UniProtKB/Swiss-Prot annotation:
This is Type II secretion system core protein G. Keywords: Cell inner membrane, Cell membrane, Membrane, Methylation, Protein transport, Transmembrane, Transmembrane helix, Transport. It comes from Escherichia coli (strain K12). Its main location: membrane. One of its GO terms (cellular component) is type II protein secretion system complex. Core component of the type II secretion system required for the energy-dependent secretion of extracellular factors such as proteases and toxins from the periplasm. Pseudopilin (pilin-like) protein that polymerizes to form the pseudopilus. Further polymerization triggers pseudopilus growth. Pfam families: N_methyl (PF07963), T2SSG (PF08334). The modification N-methylphenylalanine is found at residue 10.
Amino acid sequence: MRATDKQRGFTLLEIMVVIVIIGVLASLVVPNLMGNKEKADKQKAVSDIVALENALDMYKLDNHHYPTTNQGLESLVEAPTLPPLAANYNKEGYIKRLPADPWGNDYVLVNPGEHGAYDLLSAGPDGEMGTEDDITNWGLSKKKK
């Protein structure tokens, strides 16, 4: 080895500066990504509620009434066994499967509803009904029949 040859590479100080810069950038980006995840979850819940409303409307077109609270949203997948029975139930159902909300909870159907013909809601991120973060069909701009 010749004495004039220098080994090339990064110094410890240069590597530490790069790590600090990456840390600062990550601290700026991660909170924005987390906020977007929350918005995306809420938007998915809204989309699910709209899809369930459409399925409920199709059910009503065939059977002249919405499923009751006791029959629940399961009536959109399988014919209800509790009265009032659905005389003209579509043998394929009105939706292939019931979605869970983005937080893993079931959507709830209340019929008759307090805010319209029926109320459809998700408990929201906290998983508790009746709190401010609930996502509801009466909170959407679409008007119910």
